[in-house]
């Protein structure tokens, strides 16, 4: 089984970002470079939803950012989304960020995530399992009151084909 998340080839990331800048005139560096999900298959599935325009939001445990040494996204941030193999595939821009308890995530936000049947019920089941997979190795149990970083984004640029 391949390690996840994959370590991206920095030359590919740099070339991808340069192509994005040349195509869009954007100045500056990406705020983050990452795949979605916690497995190759999930990364590919979620990337496909982004590229299809169906997935326009994502949600992570707030504690993830602290534990992993990551910065909470903010409106205007640009991120490079990787595929399951660690290749850069698209650029998204954060449009809105709210931090709410897990139990307060709305049906409207769940639908914007673009996953499953778009229902809040599906979102809660899938994300409870996803968060549990991250928490359990750290000796923690998922709770309804854990803060969730609810990020909305737009797809602003995609590569015609994966690099390399």
Question: Residue ranges of each PLM-predicted region?
Answer:
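Mixed-charge, low-complexity intrinsically disordered regions
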Residues: 1-91, 97-164
């Amino acid at each position: 089984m391949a390690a996840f998340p994959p370590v991206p080839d920095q030359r590919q990331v740099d070339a991808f970002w340069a192509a994005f800048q040349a195509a869009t005139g954007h100045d500056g560096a990406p705020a983050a470079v990452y795949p979605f999900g916690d497995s190759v298959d999930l990364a590919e599935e979620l990337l496909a939803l982004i590229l299809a325009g169906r997935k326009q939001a994502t949600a992570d445990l707030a504690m993830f950012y602290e534990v992993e040494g990551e910065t909470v996204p903010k409106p205007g941030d640009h991120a490079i989304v990787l595929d399951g193999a660690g290749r850069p595939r698209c650029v998204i821009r954060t449009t809105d960020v709210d931090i709410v308890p897990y139990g307060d995530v709305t049906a409207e936000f769940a639908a914007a995530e673009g996953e499953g049947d778009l229902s809040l019920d599906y979102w809660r089941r899938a994300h409870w399992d996803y968060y549990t997979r991250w928490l359990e190795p750290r000796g923690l149990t998922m709770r309804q009151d854990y803060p969730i970083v609810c990020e909305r984004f737009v797809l602003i640029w995609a590569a015609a084909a994966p690099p390399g």
